Amino acid sequence: MARRLELSEMKRRIPHQARARDTVETIFEAVARILRREGLDALNTNHIAETAGVSVGTLYGYFPNKQAILVAMARRELEKTEASIRAAITRSASGSEASRAAIRALIRGFGGQNSLRRDLLEAMVVNGHYAELARPAENFARLMLKAAPGQFANLSIGLTEPQAFVLTRALVGVIRAAVFENSNLMGTDALEDELVRLAQSYVRSVASRLKSIGGQNGRDLGRAPV
């Protein structure tokens, strides 16, 4: 198993100033260009620096190696996915629509047939950050309950930690498998339908169980609610 990169290894200099942020953005753009044109095997720090038009020393001032750059780029993509999920749910008129819109945003966040995003997300796994891939799905689960309080009334306190773990890893596991297997299901209504059914059926099952045992709270069934 690959060694997990520690935070101090991921980024050496925090780009607070505009010029520093521009440099980091230039590095990111260079990496994206190389991945699209030449593939992951062609990626190394010398090639990145040359493509970005910066010195290798400047690059190392921000990132210790190419894996750190890939992880930083992947985290930015995950943040965009989370924002897309929040926006999708906010725009939806009903809980059912919210679930579908959020699932669609989650699928798009994992890149579908976008090889660049696949490379970035795989870097998270290789470097020991798999749990972070589930963060957008965790936010989806929380927001879905808020968007449909009547539909999931018994879960007003939220899912317990084990319940949230099972649901989010099920969603992420299916999407990740479809992405890395280059499945023809990616981007189809059929896959979207099944993921929506998975999420809603699981949450309804949990809500029904709570009702059948007299509305016990999440702390009786598991750890703290999510």
Positions of the model-derived regions?
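Helix-turn-helix
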Residues: 26, 30, 34-68, 72
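Hydrophobic/aromatic-rich alpha-helical bundle segments in the mid-to-C-terminal region
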Residues: 118, 122, 150-198, 206-214
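N-terminal intrinsically disordered/low-complexity leader segments
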Residues: 1-22, 92, 155, 207-226
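Amphipathic alpha-helical linker/stalk segments
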Residues: 11, 73-99, 118
